[in-house]
């Protein structure tokens, strides 16, 4: 099944599969997915919004027919399919503790119908009991584990007893919240020991070290902390299951804030380093990975990747490592003599083989030098590449390595960004901004006494998209949530951190329902 791809936010949409921005699923989509190297798809389906009343909880025949059609299309294209129960987990299954008998009866009825419908399908169809299970109104994890074990056991028995191909079909069981903390893994391991079924796999989800994955608390880079979080997570999963011969499916992986409609939250090169490392380490730990894609990676209308270079990095990671660098950005000042610029190469077991600018191979010694892991771009080369030094990207280089995909390096001319005065209400404040070639990394917010300001009160570095945004080339926007969290009448100093290393300070004050901002 490795590697896998999620048909995300499609058969959870209301009222139909196109309601959340994706087109109707076609055979061509699965042909594209298969041609790109994927061997399996995960098919998230929400059933409860297409069910009748108790006690039968009959699934709408038209809905069942639609799901059957999509399963068959994927199977026809020689893909493995993992079919699940998806948003039902928080729409009604989460009430198992407070409405036990009703929820369990509905769960039984739902899986009884699904199992009967697909009992004779190819063994390449696998079934997953529930997505991201959680329970409301419980006394804590001990009760949560007991409830999940009950659900998984009911699911297992219904499917196995339904006969046909279901007697030995691969079944996939999640941890609580599909989380990989040790207690979650241990609880599921106990369940598996009780089931004594060799055709059961486990699943967890992984979206990276949370502060990096959403850009909060200053974690703008895929650094040692983020890397250690990934390796520790995959090690725990490996030791709990794959080392004991139990398959593991990382049923969803991506970055929480990655979206083609919201560029800049996670810097592009840092994204690439994350996906490169994740793919390699999952392979080393023998984990099956399924990319969560609700349309942010593959444009399902054009059937083209929204960022072909990013997907090339993901695809390469399934089989080999790639070289990267400390950054994919080299910033040059708008005026004045240019000096040589250094980057640190992350060879990842590869050999550095040179630099290219378009079809031209740069000359070692004249255009760049390499000393150990230090790559130095000479002042003369940068001067030629920068040309008239217009703001923004002046040239794009490719660092080539002995294997994997090239590393892109943008040569960027910049000057200190300029933020202008602004006024408005607490619903949001648009701060006119001349970025002048630079790119925003994060925003720090403090009151005059040094204490943190903003909804994330535990850190001065606020969360992109929750406290601020910068999706256009002419403004930084402070959100209503950020402004509403500010103390009335207390000045806040914002420090905007840019990828060039430049910092720009700005003052903002809320007075009742009004907000004013001015350069510091």
Question: Where do the language-model regions lie?
Answer:
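Acidic/histidine-rich helix-loop elements
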Residues: 7-25, 54-59, 98-99, 211-227
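An active-site-proximal structural segment forming one wall of the substrate-binding cleft
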Residues: 21-40, 55-85, 93-129, 147-163
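Catalytic domains of carbohydrate-active enzymes, especially glycoside hydrolases
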Residues: 24-46, 237-241, 281, 288
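Active-site region of glycoside hydrolase catalytic domains
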Residues: 105-219, 236-256, 285
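Catalytic-core region of carbohydrate-active enzymes that cleave or remodel glycosidic bonds
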Residues: 157, 225-288
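Aromatic-rich peripheral "rim/lid" segments of glycoside hydrolase catalytic domains that contact
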Residues: 261-360, 366, 372-376, 388-408, ...
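Edge beta-strands of extracellular beta-sandwich domains
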Residues: 403-416, 501-519
